[in-house]
C-alpha cells in the first residue's frame, strides 16, 4: 500500500495520506454495526446522543417562530423530564442566527450557522467569506462551511485548502466545521484525502454531509473519516472533532456512530466538544426509547 505526502499552503504543511483498504474498512464498519448497547448502558447512550446533537432546520420556509421553537426544544428536549440533557447546538441559516442567539441566551446550547454558499460552495471566495463574517457578527458560535468539491475533484487541492484557511480566519473565535459532502467525493480515498486537507487547513471539525443529497452519512464513510482524524492526531498532536449528518433518524443509528467513534478514537471523543450528530428528526426517536 503506497503512502503519499501531499503539501499544502505557503508554509509547506505536509500530510501523509495512506490509501484506504476498502474491503477491510467496510468489513470493520459492518462488524461495529453488530455491537449492541447493554441494557444498563442504554440510558447513558441515549443521553450522550442528545448531548452530542446539533438540532437542525435548514429549510427555505424557516421563520423566526420556527427557530424559536427549535431552540426551546434544544434547551428542554423533554419538558416532563428534567434529567434529559439539552442538545449541543442548533444549526440554522445565517439569517436566523440573531433569533437563535436570543432564544438560547443563558444556556449551554451553541448556535451553529451554515455559511459560505451552503450547500454547494459555488460562489466567489469573497462572497463566501462575507457570508461567514456576517454569521459571526450575528453571534454564531460555530460555522459550518462546505468543501469546494468542484476545485477538489478537479485536482486543485491547493485552492480548496486556501479557501478553508481563509474561512477559518474569517471565523475569529467561532469554531469551524468543514462539510466534505462525502456522497459526492466518489471513493474512500477521496474522503480520506479531503479529511486530511480540511484538518491541515485548520478545521476544528470535519463533517460528513449537508443533508441535501441522498448519499449522505454512512458507517463506512464515518469510519473512514474517524481513521483520518486518528492518524492526523498521531502526526500532528492536534485533535479534530467529527460530525455525522444526513439521514440519521433513529436512536439505533446514533448508537452505531457512537460505537464507531469510541472504538476508533477513544472515549475522549465521546463528548459534544469532539463529536456531533446533525439531525432534525432524530431527537424524537431518541426520546421515545
What are these model-derived regions, one by one?
Residues 1-50:
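Charged, compositionally biased N-terminal leader segments and the immediate start
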Residues 20-24, 28-31, 84, 215-216, ...:
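N-terminal start-of-chain detector that recognizes signal peptides
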Residues 40-48, 61-85, 95-242, 249-280, ...:
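Alpha/beta enzyme core
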Residues 58:
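A short, histidine- and acid-enriched strand-loop-helix "catalytic/donor-clamping" loop
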Amino acid at each position: 500500500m503506497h503512502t503519499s505526502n501531499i503539501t499544502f499552503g505557503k508554509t509547506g504543511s505536509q500530510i501523509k495520506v495512506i490509501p484506504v483498504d476498502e474491503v477491510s474498512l467496510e468489513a470493520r464498519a459492518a462488524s461495529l454495526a453488530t455491537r449492541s448497547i447493554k441494557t444498563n448502558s442504554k440510558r447513558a447512550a441515549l443521553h450522550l446522543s442528545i448531548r452530542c446533537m446539533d438540532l437542525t432546520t435548514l429549510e427555505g420556509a424557516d421563520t423566526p417562530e420556527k427557530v424559536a421553537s427549535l431552540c426551546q426544544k434544544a434547551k428542554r428536549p423533554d419538558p416532563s423530564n428534567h434529567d434529559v440533557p439539552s442538545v449541543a447546538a442548533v444549526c440554522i441559516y445565517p439569517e436566523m442566527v440573531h433569533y437563535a442567539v436570543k432564544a438560547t441566551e443563558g444556556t449551554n446550547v451553541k448556535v451553529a450557522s451554515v455559511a459560505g454558499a451552503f450547500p454547494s460552495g459555488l460562489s466567489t471566495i469573497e462572497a463566501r467569506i462575507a457570508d461567514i463574517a456576517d454569521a459571526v457578527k450575528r453571534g454564531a458560535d460555530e460555522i459550518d462551511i462546505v468543501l469546494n468539491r468542484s476545485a477538489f475533484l478537479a485536482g486543485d487541492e491547493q485552492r480548496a485548502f486556501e479557501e478553508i484557511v481563509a474561512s477559518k480566519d474569517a471565523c475569529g473565535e467561532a469554531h469551524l466545521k468543514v462539510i466534505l459532502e462525502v456522497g459526492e467525493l466518489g471513493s474512500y480515498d477521496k474522503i480520506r484525502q479531503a479529511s486530511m486537507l480540511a484538518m491541515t487547513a485548520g478545521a476544528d471539525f470535519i463533517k460528513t454531509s449537508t443533508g441535501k443529497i441522498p448519499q449522505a452519512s454512512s458507517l463506512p464513510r464515518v469510519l473512514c473519516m474517524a481513521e483520518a482524524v486518528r492518524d492526523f492526531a498521531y502526526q500532528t498532536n492536534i485533535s479534530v472533532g467529527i460530525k455525522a449528518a444526513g439521514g440519521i433518524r433513529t436512536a439505533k443509528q446514533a448508537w452505531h456512530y457512537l460505537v464507531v467513534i469510541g472504538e476508533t478514537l477513544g472515549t475522549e471523543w465521546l463528548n459534544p466538544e469532539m463529536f456531533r450528530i446533525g439531525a432534525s428528526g432524530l431527537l424524537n426517536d431518541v426520546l421515545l426509547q
